[in-house]
C-alpha cells in the first residue's frame, strides 16, 4: 500500500504493510540524506494484558512524509534484565535526541518510570543515528528532581541546548544542558508553576518561527486526551506568555483526540506540522474527556507536591502489569496556521503538504 496524502486518525501502515509503531516521537529532515526520519516508542507488543509497556525505539525513513520504511529497532529492549531501564515492563517514553557537533555524538534522552514511583531520564549516545547506543547515565535526575514528559532543543545561534520537562505534577522546568548534551548545568527556570492535574502541563513540544519561540503542552490525564495550550517566549529562562488553546473548532476539548509530541518544519516552506499521538482511537473517547478531567480534579484536590531532593536509586526489579493497549494507537498530523504570532490548528479529514 502507498499513500499520497495525510489522513489524520486513520490507520497508517509502513511500506511492509504493518502499522507504524513509533509513538511519543520525533520527526526531522536530514538534508544530507534527503530523507525524513521518524523515531519513537515501539508499542507492537503492548496489549494491555501483559507486563510489556514498550518494545524498544523504532526508526522509520521516508522521502515524501507519507510512505515510511521500517529501519528497525535502534534501541532494543532488554527483556532478560530487570536491572536495565530498557526492560519492557518499565515505562520508557518519548525518546528524543540531539546531535552534538562538539562531540560528534547522537545523544538520546529517554523518560523512564519504574513501578509508578520513580521518574527519571536514561541518557545514551551513539556515533550513528541508527546506533548502537551506550549508556552515559542509566538513572539521571536533573537538578535532583523527578522528571516526566520532556522536549530537547539546541539553539543554532548560541550553540546552547535545553531540556524542557514536567516536574511531576506541578511545574514545567527549562534547564540548560552541558556542552556535550548529556546532563544539565544547574541553570534552570520554572514555568506553569503550582498547577495540579489535569491542568499540570506535560508533553512539552518546542518549535520556533520568525524569531519567536513556542511550546505546545498538554494537560495531565494519562492516555485520555485533553485541551492543549501554547505559549510564546523570547528568552528560554524568561517569561512564557500563555496564548491559550491552539485548536480551532475542537468542540470536544481533546486536541482532536490526540496529544502533540513534535512539530516538523518542512524544508524550503513556511509550513509547520503538529505531529501527535492518538493514544485511544476509539470513537467514544472524546465523549469521556470532561468526565475524566473532573475525576482527576477530585483525585488531586488538596495535592501537595513533594519538593524534596530526589536521589538516584536502583530500579525496583519488579514487573508491572499494564492495562493500556497502546498497540492500537494512531497518529494525527495537522498543519499549523497563524493568527498573527499565535499558532492555530484546524481539523482536516485529509490533506497534502505540497498544496500548502
Regions found by a protein language model. Give the residues of each.
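Carbohydrate-active catalytic/glycan-binding domains of CAZyme proteins
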Residues: 1-356
Amino acid at each position: 500500500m502507498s499513500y499520497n496524502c495525510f489522513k489524520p486518525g486513520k490507520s497508517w501502515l509502513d511500506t511492509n504493510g504493518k502499522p507504524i509503531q513509533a509513538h511519543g516521537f520525533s520527526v526531522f529532515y536530514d538534508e544530507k540524506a534527503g530523507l525524513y526520519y521518524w523515531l519513537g516508542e515501539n508499542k507492537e507488543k503492548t496489549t494491555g494484558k501483559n507486563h510489556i509497556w514498550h518494545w524498544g525505539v523504532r526508526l522509520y525513513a521516508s522521502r515524501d512524509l507519507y510512505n515510511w520504511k521500517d529501519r528497525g529497532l535502534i534501541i532494543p529492549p532488554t527483556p532478560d534484565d530487570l536491572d536495565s531501564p530498557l526492560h519492557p515492563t518499565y515505562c520508557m517514553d518519548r525518546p528524543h535526541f540531539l546531535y552534538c557537533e562538539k562531540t560528534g555524538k547522537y545523544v538520546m534522552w529517554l523518560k523512564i518510570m519504574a513501578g509508578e514511583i520513580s521518574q527519571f531520564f536514561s541518557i545514551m549516545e551513539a556515533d550513528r543515528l541508527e546506533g548502537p547506543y551506550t549508556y552515559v547515565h542509566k538513572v539521571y535526575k536533573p537538578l535532583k528532581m523527578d522528571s516526566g514528559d520532556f522536549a530537547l532543543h539546541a539553539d543554532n545561534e548560541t550553540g546552547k541546548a535545553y531540556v524542557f520537562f514536567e516536574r511531576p505534577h506541578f511545574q514545567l522546568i527549562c534547564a540548560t544542558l552541558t556542552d556535550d548534551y548529556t546532563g544539565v548545568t544547574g541553570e534552570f527556570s520554572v514555568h506553569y508553576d503550582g498547577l495540579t492535574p489535569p491542568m499540570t502541563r506535560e508533553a512539552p513540544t518546542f518549535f520556533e518561527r520568525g524569531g519567536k519561540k513556542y511550546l505546545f503542552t498538554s494537560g495531565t490525564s494519562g492516555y485520555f486526551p485533553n485541551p492543549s495550550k501554547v505559549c510564546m517566549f523570547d528568552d528560554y529562562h524568561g517569561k512564557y506568555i500563555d496564548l491559550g488553546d491552539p485548536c480551532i473548532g475542537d468542540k470536544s476539548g481533546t486536541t482532536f483526540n490526540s496529544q502533540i509530541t513534535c512539530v516538523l518544519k518542512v524544508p524550503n516552506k513556511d509550513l509547520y506540522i503538529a505531529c501527535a499521538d492518538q493514544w485511544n482511537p476509539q470513537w467514544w473517547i472524546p465523549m469521556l474527556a470532561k468526565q475524566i478531567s473532573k475525576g482527576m480534579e477530585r483525585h488531586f484536590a488538596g495535592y501537595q507536591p513533594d519538593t524534596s531532593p530526589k536521589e538516584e536509586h536502583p530500579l525496583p526489579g519488579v514487573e508491572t502489569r499494564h492495562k493500556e493497549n497502546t498497540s492500537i494507537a494512531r497518529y494525527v498530523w495537522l498543519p499549523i496556521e497563524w493568527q498573527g504570532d499565535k499558532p492555530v490548528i484546524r481539523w482536516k479529514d485529509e490533506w497534502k503538504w505540497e498544496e500548502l
